[in-house]
Amino acid sequence: MAIPKVTIKYLNGLLGIAPESQDGLLALVVLGATGAGETFKLGTPYKVYGPSSLVALGITEDNNARLVELVREFYSECDEGTPLYIVGIASGTMTSFCNKDTGKIVSLVESLKGELRGVMIANSAAAGEVKEGIAADVLSAAPIAQVAAEHCANVLYAPIFVILEGRGYQSSASLQDLSEKTYNRVGIVIGDTKADSDDAAIGILAGRIAASPIQRNIGAVLDGPLTPVEMYLGNDTIDNSMDDVRTAHDKGYIIPRIHVGRSGYFYCDDPMACDPTDDYGHLTARRTIDKAARIAYDTLLDYLLSEIELNEDGTMQQPVVKSWQAAVESAINTQMTSRGELSATNGSGCRCIIDATQNVLATSTINVVLKVRPYGYAREIVCEIGFLTANV
């Protein structure tokens, strides 16, 4: 018999620590790219971790100048080591790429097993026909991209957002008003790092999104300015174009601006191409609700086709209802609230509601309502100022 002793065994997995997040995982799609033999095949997604990753793929400024430029922009805004998928497409339009049935956007999401959170689409070719202030292809792609993104969310259970490069900018006055649209999974960015350019600095935007937690507005001043030392709207600097910037912002475009007293450039806001009163009319709301949807799906999937203890009238027994609600709320609070991604009261940022009067025996359907508590954002701050005197 062994000598008497006390043995301590360390248990693991009790803290409920959430796994590493892929919230900022994006795909950068560049139309008009050139293949590089077996190392970089068009239509195939490649994961990179910095500009140096392009060397092994055979991607250079000589064969893919626009792609190299955008990857450099991306990593100027976020740390090297941040994963990014790049996809080169030989030719075509944004509209054709985003087509749910005949384009490549849905197959891209499928091929990456739903990992992607957003798809950023740029084009290295000429802007082509301009309509309502920017390239006609961009405007025609927006509703098509919305349909594809909704398909990914509703059918593939892989919700995404799509950002289109607002190419061929001509004037803010003639821009289509995106705030009148209903594309709450689509955004359009304008403004570039070069004067009189057909392009938009979508790599800068992608990097800022990837570097920001889901609840953080890309224009948050406390996060500091964007990296470019000069940014342009058409042929003039953003500094000299603030009237046009305001007009474009009011029409729902993602666009850089300046703040008096601060150096550098900041995004005005993070609008999607829809009515700003839409619950998901901002990228922060879109990313927040999509993450909650992914977590809820993964949690509830465990219960699919499981036996459910019922009452005599076919309704769920109360302990079962409570356990389901607790499981969903715990998953959301562990993976979101504890990260500061939801507004918390008493440690919880969500509420899961299951109507206990549902006749599950008759319908085999259980309706679940999940509500998460978002943050508010100070989009306007009004400060009244005057003199402090004995008369007041």
Predicted features, each with a name:
Residues R208-A327, V369-V392:
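Long, contiguous, structured domain-core segments that constitute the functional module of a protein
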Residues A2-A33, Y232-G252, P256-I258, G349-R351, ...:
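Anaerobic metallocofactor- and corrinoid-dependent redox/one-carbon enzyme cores
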Residues L57, L70-E77, I295, T299, ...:
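Residues that form generic nucleotide/phosphate-binding pockets
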